[in-house]
Amino acid sequence: MFGIFSRCDVRVQAAVTQGMQLKTIRDTGGYEFGVIWEPTLRQGSVLLKGEESFTLADIAMWRDLICTIEGVQVIATIWSAHSNIETHIPRMLVTFDAGGRKCDDFLTWLAKRLVYVYSPDQMELMWWPQEAEKVKEYASSLWSPDSKPKFPPIAELLKERHSAIQCDSAYRLAFEVLLTASMSEDIVQEFEQLVLSSELRDGEEIHFVELLRPTDPIYLEYHEDAQRYRLDGVVVISSTSHDQCEDFATDLVNSLSAHARVRLTRLFGRQHIGVLLAGGLPAYGWQHNEVFVTKE
């Protein structure tokens, strides 16, 4: 999923975010929302916030509906737990293919369709489109928690080593979860429950991101037995020191079933990809293969 090592660099802003632009538009439902526009990739992403009352079954049903909407390229479900926050509110990052449209044309196109994403007619469920300021704040809370929120986020202190990344005062580790559509349901539920039931020590966080890529509908027309989507997963854990973060990682691995454990791998050299995804930024590993590691 996350490609190969391609280069090393030292930055306080991830290279994959440098072309991202944060736009604002109002949709037909009257909501103002932020759109992350990526001109090189010709895609735009919106961040949606759910309710604590949403069940895992609700979210799975909603995603099945959203997969069929024109232009939907990726649906990323973000579950988070923090030591100082008792609620667990899911977020969704939905990325759309602009289909060759220029930015203004794409935003107009998206404004007419987004209501069918956050409030589909077939379900009594509504997500809340996040305004540009909320998108900026949430992304900064992962990448630059002690710095002033900016977009793209810039950390005052950032050190990425081969196995860990320090974002300001927070130390983070990222893992990839190897999933397949045919055998992922139990594993996904295990990681979701891990986040929802985690007993965290002071300063600890855990994030699980499930990435769903719908199969091209034209392809499905001619291959009825094909999988409707591809799945990948990312886990990001955080603490106040590197040693505590490693202890957290050990506890996490030991708490998993053997079946889930063998599908968990460290994102060596690519910790930044996991952190950005957990922060609601479309830094998809199959689109970006940059690596940067701090030289001692």
Label each region the model flagged.
Residues M1-E296:
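Extended, folded cores of ATP/NTP-driven motor/assembly subunits in large transport
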